[in-house]
Amino acid sequence: MTTFFQQHFSRNKWLAYAQLMRFDKPIGTLLLLYPTLWALFAAAGGMPPLSVLVIFVLGVIVMRAAGCVINDYADRHIDGEVKRTSQRPLATGRVTTTEAKILFVLLLCIAFVLDLLLNRYTFLLSFVAVALAIIYPFMKRFTHLPQVVLGMAFGWAIPMAYGAVSESLPLECWLLFFANIFWTVAYDTQYAMVDRDDDLRIGVKSTAILFAQYDNKIIALLQFITLVLLVIFGWISQYHWGYFVVLGLSASLFSHQCWLTKQRVREQCFKAFLNNHYFGLGVFFAILVGIYA
């Protein structure tokens, strides 16, 4: 029994589990959290019910962790071939495949319990979220557009939030959802540019490879479409003009990102990717201004 606990629950093992769930890298959680907050506050026309807000924040943390576990499980044979991912717990053997599968199921069970605390409408929508989380990691083997599936996975909290608050999916919901997809494809392409050379060598597909020398131009186009959809969203929602001012200020971050990725240097592309959480926060502030000003 002592040996069992030493193997599976030692301090080093807990650290490995935390790294597998990316608790040491909160950027992904933030990129998932901000669109969720957009939708919750937009659907409620202000502060959503506190219980719903807490459930969704916890759900974001849990599902982000689950997504990382299943992603690393799917990539366990190729992560060791990529410089950026070579030290991940599954790639180095610090976490076994059995442990990863058990952890994934445990996280899904926690998410299931959280879903039970919401209305039936949202509970049914949650099955799509689970399906997208499971499908996404395997898409890079079959298509150059896995980032689109990631955008759907990261954005599905938006219809769930509308469902939880209003039990409806109005046009505003879908404008936010598709804005999030275009934004996600843009920032995850920046992320994929970091690994492009390694991905080409091992045969992994991504939008960074698909877009090739047009990558920066297409990223800029995707960001422009994101802004157009967010402007339409604010107009239909009849937000105060302050929303558009804050959104415009947030959009200036895209110009900075384009400058960072201009030379396609790995470190600079990664900085551009990280910069996106400020945009997500900016849009959240814009929505608050639009509602309360």
Swiss-Prot record:
It is an enzyme of class 2 (transferase). Keywords: Cell inner membrane, Cell membrane, Magnesium, Membrane, Transferase, Transmembrane, Transmembrane helix, Ubiquinone biosynthesis. It is a multi-pass membrane protein. It is found in: Cell inner membrane. Disulfide bonds: none annotated. It catalyses: all-trans-octaprenyl diphosphate + 4-hydroxybenzoate = 4-hydroxy-3-(all-trans-octaprenyl)benzoate + diphosphate. One of its GO terms (biological process) is ubiquinone biosynthetic process. The keyword Transferase applies. Its cofactor is Mg(2+). GO terms for cellular component: plasma membrane. Signal peptide: none annotated. Its EC number is 2.5.1.39. Belongs to the UbiA prenyltransferase family. This is 4-hydroxybenzoate octaprenyltransferase. The lineage of its organism: Bacteria, Pseudomonadati, Pseudomonadota, Gammaproteobacteria, Pasteurellales.
